[in-house]
């Protein structure tokens, strides 16, 4: 019995090491892709294409940050949502030259599986706010709250911008991604209101 227990412990430790190494390699591969996109972007003098490539770059970065955190931590099953979301917020703020304050209150851990979807959703919400919600040279505010208890989670995102144009909303890839990730991957209840700026509420269980 003692030998079997020791063998199981060794096997689990080896599995943990392999998974951490996998996260490290995935992160490095994503960083290479990001670098290639950035180099290509620097060679192009077209603002629309520049924004498109930056958006793609940030989507990959959102996934890369998660793999980086999973590699750094002792556990690979959960991630600190505050630490993860801070990285995404910082990335978006550096990518777009807008005077927008991002105020956030995030206090929970997330499973690594849910975290990848939440990170991508947050990335798209922030991208939409920074790109479309505010007129050029006008300041704005984004509020994010995210809490979890007993495997029940609530994400509330809002900005005080112009709101969504219904026609743009239907054709927006970013909004389509948000709805697909929220409803099909997280199995979340989703509510979007656009009366004064934009407010998005997500609720789901794990």
What is the predicted role of each segment?
Residues 139-151:
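Short beta-strand/loop element within the Bergerat-fold HATPase_c
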Residues 166-193:
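ATP phosphate-binding glycine-rich loop and adjacent ATP-lid/helix-beta elements
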Residues 141, 163, 195-201:
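Glycine-rich nucleotide-binding loop
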Residues 159:
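Acidic ATP/Mg2+-coordinating residue in the GHKL
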Residues 12-13, 37-49, 74-75:
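Short acidic helix/loop segment immediately C-terminal to the autophosphorylated histidine
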Residues 10-19, 23, 45, 96-126, ...:
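Conserved short strand/loop->alpha-helix "switch" segment adjacent to the catalytic nucleotide/phosphoryl-transfer site
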Residues 1-5, 9-12, 16-19, 23, ...:
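Amphipathic, heptad-repeat alpha-helical coiled-coil "signal-transmission/dimerization" linkers
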Residues 53-61, 65, 77-94:
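Short beta-to-alpha transition helix within the HATPase_c
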């Amino acid at each position: 019995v003692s030998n079997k227990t020791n063998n199981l412990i060794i096997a689990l430790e080896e599995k943990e090491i392999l998974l951490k190494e996998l996260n490290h390699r995935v992160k490095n591969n994503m960083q290479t892709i990001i670098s290639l996109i950035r180099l290509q972007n620097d060679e192009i003098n077209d603002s629309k294409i520049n924004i498109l490539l930056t958006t793609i770059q940030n989507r990959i970065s959102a996934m890369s940050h998660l793999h980086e955190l999973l590699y750094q931590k002792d556990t690979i099953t959960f991630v600190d949502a505050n630490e993860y979301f801070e990285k995404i917020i910082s990335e978006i703020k550096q990518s777009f030259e807008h005077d927008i304050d991002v105020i956030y209150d995030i206090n929970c851990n997330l499973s690594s599986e849910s975290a990848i979807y939440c990170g991508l959703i947050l990335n798209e919400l922030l991208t939409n706010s920074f790109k479309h919600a505010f007129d050029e040279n006008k300041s704005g505010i984004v509020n994010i709250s995210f809490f979890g208890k007993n495997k029940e989670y609530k994400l509330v995102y809002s900005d005080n911008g112009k709101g969504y144009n219904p026609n743009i909303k239907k054709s927006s890839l970013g909004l389509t991604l948000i709805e697909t990730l929220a409803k099909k991957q997280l199995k979340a209840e989703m509510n979007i209101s656009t009366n004064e700026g934009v407010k998005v509420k997500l609720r789901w269980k794990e």
